[in-house]
């Protein structure tokens, strides 16, 4: 049985991804930020819910080492923790950018740095980041400056990881969705047809494919999932 780490597992996307991987027979280690969030998950013998502050580099490194000791091999990580901020250049401060980098990049990097070394030793592993269309297209990101800049770092990190892992069965992939069909997005954009958005369950299936053996021959570091947006 493969063991996967899913961060931000109780969010709209995280819940769908956790369900998809459990349904496909994986052992899932799911992270949340508070003890009370454990109640969001139904009991499952293949689910291990852990509370960890991924913004704390020392605590995250210790957490990853404890997982390796417990499960011996971590086959994949899906790093879903993140957050959104609106603001164009004139309204975005350096502090705004730093906050978004801490949330969208550092939480992923703190996991990746120790976990990638484990995967390099095993010559096998998958790391999946969640990017965003505004980080790839200026027309989409001009009013999301801090958010787009913070997410753009994930694309470069994936490039570095893939270069270092060249010749090994290790890949880093950034999946860049457009708007997700979530209750919050439906409420904030009531005049938009949600049929054009990306369903979390559909994105979860794509993430499972990326991690699975079916994806072994593919070396594509960026996958765009825009639906009809």
Locate the predicted segments by residue.
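Rossmann-fold cofactor-recognition segment
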Residues: 43-58
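Catalytic loop of short-chain dehydrogenase/reductase
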Residues: 126-166
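C-terminal helical subdomain
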Residues: 167-170, 174-175, 182, 191-229
């Amino acid at each position: 049985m493969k063991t996967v780490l899913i961060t931000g597992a109780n969010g709209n996307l995280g819940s769908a991804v956790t369900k998809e991987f459990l349904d496909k027979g994986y052992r899932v280690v799911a992270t949340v930020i508070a003890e009370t969030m454990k109640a969001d998950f139904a009991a499952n013998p293949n689910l291990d819910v852990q509370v960890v502050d991924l913004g704390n580099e020392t605590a995250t490194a210790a957490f990853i080492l404890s997982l390796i000791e417990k499960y011996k091999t971590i086959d994949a990580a899906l790093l879903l923790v993140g957050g959104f901020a609106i603001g164009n250049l004139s309204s975005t401060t350096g502090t705004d950018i730093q906050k978004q980098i801490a949330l969208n990049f550092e939480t992923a990097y703190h996991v990746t740095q120790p976990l990638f070394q484990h995967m390099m030793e095993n010559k096998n592993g998958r790391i999946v980041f969640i990017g965003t269309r505004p980080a790839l297209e200026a027309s989409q990101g001009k009013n999301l400056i801090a958010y787009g800049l913070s997410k753009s770092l994930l694309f470069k990190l994936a490039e570095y990881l893939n270069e270092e892992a060249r010749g090994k069965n290790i890949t880093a992939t950034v999946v860049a969705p457009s708007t997700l069909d979530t209750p919050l997005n439906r409420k904030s954009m009531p005049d938009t047809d949600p049929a054009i958005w990306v369903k979390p369950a559909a994105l979860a299936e794509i993430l499972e494919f990326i991690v699975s053996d079916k994806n072994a021959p593919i070396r594509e570091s960026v996958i765009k999932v825009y639906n009809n947006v």
